[in-house]
């Protein structure tokens, strides 16, 4: 994959998603990935900030962009237990304290769902966009209706992740 990306005639990003260990971030950066995501979303705020700052320290000198998550996008097998919407003030503080390049936020999507039966919080995304000036990312977007994907973009999302139906 990395070699294909290097040979590509169009700009290509090779991204490590949802790494929870800094060793995985180091390995991806050393291997030539151009983007990594450190996922400390299940950690308390201060611990998430701390681990994310280290990921930025590892990646930034090598020109690798770093994404992180604040709030928690749940999984279809246990969506309510681990889902926590992103607080705009917390997102603003997190972005300022960590220096990440992109921020994944939780506004109602759920990982691994082929059809989404949840209410997306478009107003929440707008409020986050007002205070966070880096690119916002939406995870767990498989099954979101096209019209809602467009609304997410209109409300400030610049990257939308989906993979469940591609597996």
Regions found by a protein language model. Give the residues of each.
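Alpha/beta enzyme core
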Residues: 1-11, 18-134, 146-157, 162
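Thr-Gly-centered strand-to-loop micro-motif
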Residues: 138-140
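Short, intrinsically disordered, charge-balanced linker/junction segments flanking boundaries
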Residues: 165-167
